[in-house]
């Protein structure tokens, strides 16, 4: 059966007409835009034939907005109205931003929902608005170079961006007038670029160290399928941090501290130039105000060594998650301008025991991979056999009785994905159920991260355990989570889209994973105890309900024995002895065996009253 293609009026391309689509690397330090022309990927250059557009926005007089190199030139002159590295702020709360980056030169205000607004000469602007200005610049550049309107764009984001950060990126694109075909993880985009160019199969590590973020992905390439086995990284680690370490070193060596935001910016710019010069030189001279000195590559290596080590710890964890060893990695792809630092390449090579791949410019590889994906999604490669599988970083689950976590989608599950599970009511006549969505690897809700709650109402009153509620978790290709709960007999349902106001750092994810391993035995013991307590409460509720209806079926001695077993089990379920609670449940079950049989006989007699054998 043929597919029917539907498009908005005026947007339908003529048969075999090449549709204009771009891949955008919206970077912390620099951004790029790329496309596919005549089956070749290429970076689109600006009017001065430069591939990079600095991710810098200046807000000037008369609402004049400048983006890129020109904005960068104004950064040291007018730092409070020049926004740099806005990617670090997007999707975060003001409280989070101020805690992470206390030395930013901006004046912040809080929006109604607690998100940061940057006070500028123009007005108070959000990180989404600032990002949209960068995207507008890239869009205009692409239209000028391609000579037409864009059908869509694939925009890359760090693998550890959470729902709020991804949604904010989409919002920025919408403000810029872009049709987002898909958000794509940066390491995955790099894998696409290298996978198509080399066609190699096997395990690949993508080491992506940019200006402000670090990502490590372990992928398997097999028969055209890119599968992300595991991801890791740090949303607050990059070349910017190298610059600040050098700036701090200069301050310490010279004894000269910057006196204002302008001097701070000039010092960081000097540190950046020194870092770049040390890529090709063993020693570089420094002139800072009236101080003259020099810095060697070895001194620079010592400064950045703790940060490089931090990135390699993430690599080790990702390999463990992927269940592969460094020896099994066939290729190591280097991505991001900061991977030009010789010490970084050397340390990564030693860790993976092989020479890293740098055949594609590390600054350009992500944008080129995004362009390939955009070309496919817009329909220029309908017969492409390439399949792309991303993963979620932490398990998604639901709270059940007793504060237990039932995992619906385990971590490192490929996305998009949908999983459903059925739950039931705990009490007789229960007409509502609260769905508590949690994230993490621990067994108890108290040890996991709460994402959201919503309530399903309108459940028909039934006996405990009779209602059937189907809970569905859906994670789309952009990593956004939708949860729906539906009562099956009535079809009544409720749903929610999870958009946390701010997300987890890699350190927090690391702590959550480490805690789950360190506390594995205690967690299992706690879960077994909680499960027995829940079962004890269920049995007690059930017996009390039965006694309220059919106490007359028991003599005094039998009633006394059941009550004694009830009291004993109630005491036990408040203690911490799992085996004792289990035995208490067995004792109550034994005490109520005859009672249960009599109730069954009574129900059968009631059902048969007024009916003949022929009726049955």
Swiss-Prot record:
Q: One Pfam family this chain carries?
A: HSP70
Q: Which domain of life is it from?
A: Bacteria
| Keyword Transmembrane applies | no
Keyword list (alphabetical) reads:
ATP-binding, Chaperone, Nucleotide-binding
GO terms under biological process: iron-sulfur cluster assembly
The UniProt GO MF terms for this protein read:
ATP binding; ATP hydrolysis activity; ATP-dependent protein folding chaperone; unfolded protein binding
Function description: Chaperone involved in the maturation of iron-sulfur cluster-containing proteins. Has a low intrinsic ATPase activity which is markedly stimulated by HscB.
Return the similarity comment: Belongs to the heat shock protein 70 family.
Q: Which PANTHER family match?
A: HEAT SHOCK PROTEIN 70KDA (PTHR19375)
Q: What is this protein called?
A: Chaperone protein HscA homolog
Recorded source organism is Mannheimia succiniciproducens (strain KCTC 0769BP / MBEL55E)
């Amino acid at each position: 059966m043929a597919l029917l293609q539907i498009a908005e009026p005026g947007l339908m391309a003529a048969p075999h007409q090449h549709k204009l689509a771009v891949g955008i690397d919206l970077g912390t330090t620099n951004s790029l835009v790329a496309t596919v022309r005549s089956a070749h990927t290429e970076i689109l250059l600006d009017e001065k034939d430069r591939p990079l557009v600095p991710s810098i926005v200046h807000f000037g007089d008369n609402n004049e907005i400048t983006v890129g190199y020109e904005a960068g030139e104004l950064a040291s002159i007018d730092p409070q109205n020049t926004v740099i590295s806005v990617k670090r702020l997007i999707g975060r709360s003001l409280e989070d931003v101020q805690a992470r980056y206390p030395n930013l030169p901006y004046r912040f205000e809080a929006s109604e929902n607690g998100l940061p607004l940057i006070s500028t000469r123009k007005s108070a602007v959000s990180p989404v608005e600032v990002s949209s200005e960068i995207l507008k610049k890239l869009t205009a550049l692409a239209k000028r170079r391609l000579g037409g309107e864009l059908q869509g764009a694939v925009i890359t984001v760090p693998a550890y961006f959470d729902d709020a950060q991804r949604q904010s990126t989409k919002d920025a694109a919408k403000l810029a007038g872009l049709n987002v075909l898909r958000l794509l993880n940066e390491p995955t985009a790099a894998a696409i670029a290298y996978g198509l160019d080399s066609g190699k199969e096997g395990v690949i590590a993508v080491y992506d160290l940019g200006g402000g973020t670090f990502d490590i992905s372990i992928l398997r390439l097999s028969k055209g399928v890119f599968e992300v086995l595991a991801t890791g990284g740090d949303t607050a680690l990059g070349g910017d941090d190298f610059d600040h370490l050098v700036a701090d070193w200069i301050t310490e060596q010279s004894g000269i501290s910057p006196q204002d935001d302008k001097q701070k910016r000039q010092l960081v710019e000097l540190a950046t130039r020194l870092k770049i010069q040390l890529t090709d030189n063993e020693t570089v001279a420094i002139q800072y105000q009236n101080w003259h000195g020099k810095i060697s590559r070895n001194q620079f290596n010592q400064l950045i060594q703790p940060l490089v080590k931090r990135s390699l710890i993430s690599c080790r964890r990702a390999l463990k998650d992927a269940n592969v060893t460094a020896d099994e990695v066939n290729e190591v792809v280097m991505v991001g301008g900061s991977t030009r630092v010789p010490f970084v390449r050397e340390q990564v090579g030693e860790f993976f025991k092989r020479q890293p791949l740098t055949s594609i410019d590390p600054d350009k590889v992500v944008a080129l991979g995004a362009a390939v994906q955009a070309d496919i999604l817009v329909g220029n490669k309908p017969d492409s056999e390439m399949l792309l599988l991303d993963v979620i970083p932490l398990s998604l689950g639901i709270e059940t009785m007793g504060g237990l976590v039932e995992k619906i989608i385990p971590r490192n599950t490929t996305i998009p994905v949908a999983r459903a599970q059925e739950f039931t009511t705990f009490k007789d006549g229960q007409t509502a159920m609260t769905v508590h969505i949690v994230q993490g690897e621990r067994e108890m809700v108290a040890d996991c991260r709460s994402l959201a709650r919503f309530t399903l109402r309108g459940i028909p009153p039934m006996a405990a355990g009779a209602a059937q509620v189907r809970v569905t978790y859906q994670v789309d290709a952009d990593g956004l989570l939708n949860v729906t709960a539906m009562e099956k007999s009535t079809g009544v349902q409720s749903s929610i889209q999870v958009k946390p106001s701010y997300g987890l750092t890699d350190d927090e994810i690391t702590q959550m994973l480490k805690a789950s391993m360190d506390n594995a035995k205690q967690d299992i013991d706690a879960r077994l105890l909680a499960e027995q307590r829940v079962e004890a409460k269920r049995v007690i509720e059930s017996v009390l309900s039965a006694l309220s209806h059919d106490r007359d079926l028991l003599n005094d001695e039998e009633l006394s024995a059941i009550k004694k077993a009830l009291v004993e089990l109630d005491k036990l379920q408040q203690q911490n002895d799992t085996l004792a609670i289990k035995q208490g449940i067995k004792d109550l079950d034994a005490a109520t065996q005859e009672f249960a049989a009599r109730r069954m006989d009574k129900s059968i007699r009631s059902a048969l009253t007024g009916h003949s054998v022929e009726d049955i």
